[in-house]
Amino acid sequence: MGAANAAIAAIRTAKAANTIIVPGNAWTGAHSWYATDYGTANAVAMLNITDPANNTIFEVHQYLDASSGGEGAGCVSAKIGSARLAPFVKWLRDNGKKGFVGEFAGADNATCNAAVTDMLQYMMASSDVLVGWLWWAAGPMWNDYIFTIEPKNGVARPQMALLKPFLF
């Protein structure tokens, strides 16, 4: 946490009052927020982040496949997104913190579509502590990547229909 706290202190010393988004360790997974595979769990380590302006948000990533790494087109279940986010959301509430889902995605199939919708609904229901989310990925370089939402030949990708009701 030394480097993160030094960066935050330097930003605040420069009189910047903006929100700072702080990622966790080990790909900053919501599913692994309490894991100690890489040493101290994010759930413990992130409590040592010091911001004189008290204006930090904790970022997690969460994919819906078996590895939680966005490595395949299969999703574990229709409720896996909310199940994997729940411990992180509880940590935010218990500690008076705010969070941000910096990466999430699911492929275009029935289970993943249900899981993405469930996760979006859960994030909206948790808006007291979750301040936003980003879908992975978009942009012309992704071509036919399973998670891209970049339109193909002017036609929206199927996942956009899932995301659209949650955009405001």
Question: Which functions belong to the PLM regions below?
Answer:
Residues M1-V131, T148-N153, R157, L162-K164:
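Extracellular glycoside hydrolase catalytic/binding regions
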Residues M141-D144, E150:
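Amphipathic alpha-helical interaction segments
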